[in-house]
């Protein structure tokens, strides 16, 4: 099993997956990531970065952004795929650099 790390505009986090090395998405593939695949720990870390365009503030009184772009049909394009080995965890990690696909991008 491969650990998957997603990178969107410089923000990286791990997603839960059961992919094997030979089934990891390649450059040019379109992937869908449900927000439920992001652990609570990484979700909390991502919420600390309100300046990222991926997030939208609920309102100014609530001090918490919403990951509005992550839903069941959010498509992302894989721009780059790199591999590394996590010595501490003793497992292979695949880093997928992705960007959101908007209607105007098609």
Predicted regions mapped to residue ranges:
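Acidic, low-complexity, intrinsically disordered interaction modules
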Residues: 29, 33-88
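Generic secondary-structure microfeatures
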Residues: 8-10, 23, 35-37
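Short solvent-exposed strand/turn elements
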Residues: 79, 87-106
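Short alpha-helix capping/helix-loop boundary micro-motifs
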Residues: 14-21
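Short, acidic/hydrophobic/Gly-rich beta-strand patch recurrent on exposed beta strands
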Residues: 5-7, 18, 96-99
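Short, well-ordered loop/turn sites that connect or cap secondary structure elements
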Residues: 23-29
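Residues at beta-strand starts and edge strands
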Residues: 2, 72-74, 90-94
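Short, basic/aromatic beta-hairpin or loop at an interaction surface
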Residues: 1-13
């Amino acid at each position: 099993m491969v650990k998957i790390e997603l990178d969107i505009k410089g923000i990286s986090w791990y997603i839960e997956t059961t992919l094997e090395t030979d089934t990891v998405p390649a450059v040019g593939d379109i992937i869908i990531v449900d927000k439920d695949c992001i652990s609570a720990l990484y979700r909390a870390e991502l919420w600390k970065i309100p300046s990222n365009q991926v997030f939208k503030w609920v309102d100014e009184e609530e001090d918490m952004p919403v990951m509005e772009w992550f839903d069941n049909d959010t498509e992302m394009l894989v721009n780059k795929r790199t591999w590394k080995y996590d010595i501490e965890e003793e497992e292979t990690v695949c880093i997928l650099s992705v960007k959101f696909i908007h209607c105007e991008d098609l």
